[in-house]
């Protein structure tokens, strides 16, 4: 998909675990897109795709999703509207993805998103920051603070997450990712922990890319 900051493969992300914004989707699109580069800095993309919930085979509903992206100097605004493949046909997704090199070694990435559907009477909104510092050619450390709000009717439920990640590159294709993550929600919407307000976990992963 053209939408969002993170991707499915862990080799393409700095953090090993994914954000709430990523889990909210869309994950992928099947269809047609047209890319146009107006200059070295400015680009546009137009798309007509199946609903992102339709991941294989034919599209039985003949409902579609329309996509648009504009990018300027590494900052991207994304829009998707239409059917989601889960029974709703008026879902609007808005997304900003970008980042800035604040110094030779420090990078700030930003992802902000909003989604809403009158059919579903719900949606979500959230923001995640990606603070990453390169200490050497082989080791980087990053912090991803995130806030996510899920809406349903007149009710909102909020969850925040803080992820500290270290990346150690052993070779050009193999890296070790060590991570500590803390999730907190007074509304108890942490996935897999429906009765808990707080959750913490640690992960060590070897990621090989080819």
List PLM regions with ranges:
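Outer-membrane beta-barrel pore domains and translocons
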Residues: 1, 29, 47-51, 80-84, ...
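Transmembrane beta-barrel domains of outer membrane proteins
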Residues: 33-35, 45, 69-71, 99-101, ...
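Detector for outer-membrane/organellar transmembrane beta-barrel domains
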Residues: 61-63, 68-153, 160
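Outer-membrane beta-barrel "beta-signal"
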Residues: 72, 168-170, 180, 196-210
């Amino acid at each position: 998909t053209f939408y969002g900051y993170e991707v499915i493969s862990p080799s393409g992300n700095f953090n090993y675990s994914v954000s709430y914004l990523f889990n909210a989707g869309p994950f992928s699109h099947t269809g047609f897109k047209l890319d146009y580069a107006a200059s070295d800095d400015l680009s546009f993309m137009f798309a007509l795709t199946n609903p992102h919930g339709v991941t294989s085979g034919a599209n039985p509903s003949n409902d579609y999703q329309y996509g648009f992206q504009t990018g300027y100097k590494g900052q991207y605004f994304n829009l998707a509207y239409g059917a989601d493949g889960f029974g709703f046909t008026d879902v609007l997704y808005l997304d900003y993805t970008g980042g800035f090199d604040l110094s030779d070694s420090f990078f700030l990435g930003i992802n902000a998103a909003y989604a809403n559907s009158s059919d579903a009477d719900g949606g979500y909104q959230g923001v995640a920051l990606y603070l990453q510092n390169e200490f050497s050619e082989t080791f980087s450390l990053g912090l991803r603070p995130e806030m996510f709000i899920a809406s349903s009717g007149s009710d909102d439920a909020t969850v925040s997450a803080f992820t500290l990640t270290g990346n150690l590159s052993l070779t050009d294709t193999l890296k070790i990712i060590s991570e500590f993550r803390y999730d907190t929600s007074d509304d108890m919407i942490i996935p897999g922990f429906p009765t808990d307000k707080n959750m913490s976990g640690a992960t060590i992963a070897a990621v090989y890319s080819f």
